Amino acid sequence: NPDAIKDVKLFKGAIPSRYGGRVSSVLEIFQKEGNSKEFKMSGGIGAVASRLLAEGPIIKDKAAFLIGGRASYAHLFLPVFDIENKAYFYDLNTKLSFTINENNNLYLSGYFGRDLFAISDRFENTYGNSVGNLRWNHLFSDKLFSNLSLIYSDYYYGLELDFVGFKWNSGIQNFNLKYDLKHYLSDTFQLNYGINNIYYTFNPGKIVPNSPDSGILEDQLIKKYANEFAAYVGAEHTLSEKLSLQYGLRFSYFMRLGQDELNVYENDNPVIFDPFLLVYQEATPIGTISPDRGERLATYTNFEPRMALAYTLDPDNSIKMSYTRTTQYLHLLSNTSSPTPLDVWTPSGPFIKPQLQDQYALGYFRNIDEGTYSFETEVFYKDIQNRIDYIDGANLIANNAIEQVILNGNARAYGLEILLRKNTGRFKGWLAYTLSRSEQRTPGREPVEDNGRSNKETGINFGEWYSTPFDKTHDVSLYASYDLNKKWSFNSNFVYQTGQPTNYPVGKFEFQGLTVPFYGLRNQERLPDYHRIDVAATLTPKKNAGRTWQAEWVFSIYNVYNRMNAASINFRRNQDTGANEAIRTSIFGIVPAVTYNFKF
């Protein structure tokens, strides 16, 4: 809910040492603390979605509350446009703030959100988060303060397949205890340091029949457990008026803990390579063990250095460069090209190594015409070890031995980002363009003793680099806004992205009376390119003197030219002609909306 947000920061290149556990960018979100002096309310009522936020004092200047919610209902109007799909979301933000004394503050906040989308009567996908956070802020002095946080998070992912006859869900629960300190040693030197510990419970999946006569038996996959500890120190150092540095080190220690049952494999290798068929296959377990919950199945230790430099060439020009190492101990198992999307998280362990990323970036910034315009560009390169992929025909759903279909490989991503802004005047806007590649090679080319694979294996796509599902060669965003007068303003944006890599059948064969498709090299085809235009007009009525009520009307059209962008492409046989045909699955077309925003 944007009304509940105080500030947002995105870290793509130079990620501070206080953040870890992921090899992607970091989005830092600061929630409002609630107004302790007076009651305020804001919100918006629209044809597609509505939102409401209320905040105010419980005890003036001592305690405050904040509560806000959002919900969308665009799916109610989709049948008007002959669209049988559904897509909606709802969420709730809450926060209580208490000022104990001038040196101590206590905060209790919560978040609950759900997203749902369904494709006709084929499947329904639901996912979301529930988060609770108790934080104690303590001021030791005007130069040192700390935050002690106890956080609970519950991630849920559900999939209902009516044509199969079952509901499936998975998720992660974690308890996070973290202690962060910020120390201003001088006007030019600042230290950040702290520790945190996360205990994970993974639910790989639970199957529940959606009707008594479905023929499906209820089944709970074996839950997995892990613990992740980290300690960090980071410095922000201004060396001169022109040169500033950010540097730090993060230490992480991950333990995969015992579970009810674990397979044992010959040579500890759950995936074998058939040199005659040139395919990877699931290895047959040679036994099982039942380790205690507190037993360590695998441990990993990593040091993650961070370094960033910013140098001002002159008042209008500056350069920056950074190096970041991050480690991710959790792996997302996702079949993004499937017509029924699937997301499952699994921890690193005896057979699955953590991902290690080294990222390098070099950027240039320039102010033009005394800040009227600005220009930014950055080149980056990422090297990732132990990025996972799957063997052909991998079963990701209801699989208690997921290690039998996973291969560790390497990945790389590199590209150029350009951003041109107009910052002042009645006409403002920006143009952003990214040229990039995201590729992987599976298995990786480490020595045999490091990855447990034979150097005689061909690898996926014959051991060559191939596109990851996240590869977007071209990514263009264009935004423009124009303030016509004090009442009317207009804005529009255009988005274009190269289509997502996917797999299409290259042939078929008959097996026991069934037509079975077969595929060529992995991720060699792409979905159609994604693009759309959105427009909006905002009417701000004249504010009445002496009234605190402020309001505006927003008239918008999402996807003006009704582009039915493909979420996936599915192949089927036409029942009338018998011919094979490709079916595009899309979520939204054109969506007009009117929203009334207010605050007081």
Annotated model-derived regions:
Residues 147, 151, 318-324, 330, ...:
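Membrane-embedded beta-barrel scaffold of Gram-negative outer-membrane proteins
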Residues 1-38, 51-53:
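A beta-strand signature from Gram-negative outer-membrane beta-barrel systems
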Residues 487, 495-514, 528-534, 538-600:
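C-terminal beta-signal and adjacent terminal beta-strands/loops
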Residues 380-383, 402-506, 597:
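Gram-negative outer-membrane beta-barrel transporters
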Residues 41-47, 67-71, 108-112, 148-154, ...:
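Transmembrane beta-barrel strands of outer-membrane/channel proteins
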